[in-house]
Amino acid sequence: MVECNQLRRKRVEQEARSGCPINAAVEAFGDSWSLLVLRDVMFGNRRYFRELLAGSEERIASNILADRLKRLVSAGLLTREDAGPGRRAAYSLTEASIQLVPVFAQLGEWGLRHRPTTKRLRVRAEMLAAGGPPLWAELMAELRAIHLGTAAPERTSPSVIERLAEAYAAAS
């Protein structure tokens, strides 16, 4: 019976409800935890299961986190690097998830305008909103260097990632 349910679940996960691009996106990351996991990898530089679990502001349960990580890898939004026996597996963003930076910025800005937030947790959204597309492009280039191994952008000032981290720490 379990094997039959697993096969049915796999089939459902592979079949889209429709050919609508918004539906396709929602099916990839539209549940209540996937965007938060991606946020923590993207903005918190949490790359390991324990870091994601311990650093979750929303207190994600370990079984939910494990499930979402598997789904995000399956959807092509994260990669999982197996480090070998006794070592931790590292998760990395893919190009597809890095291209979600503008979506995160817009979601954050919407949340700032329409939902109550706390100072500490709103600081990154404020910076992304204020910086707009030029800042997003810089951040995406930095994320590509970290997660995809592309050449790091040349710097004469702190990186976007460093500035976001400093602002977050200062607001804490």
PLM region spans:
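Short amphipathic alpha-helical interaction/hinge segments
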Residues: 49, 76, 115-119
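Short histidine
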Residues: 6-9, 15-16, 33-38, 48-49, ...
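Basic, amphipathic "hinge/linker" alpha-helix immediately C-terminal to the N-terminal HTH DNA-binding motif
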Residues: 30, 84-107
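Solvent-exposed, amphipathic alpha-helical segments
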Residues: 36, 40, 77-79, 106
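Canonical helix-turn-helix DNA-binding module
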Residues: 56-80, 86
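C-terminal regulatory/oligomerization modules of transcriptional regulators
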Residues: 1-6, 104-172
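N-terminal helix-turn-helix DNA-binding core of bacterial DNA-binding proteins
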Residues: 20-61
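N-terminal leader segment of winged-helix/HTH proteins
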Residues: 1-29
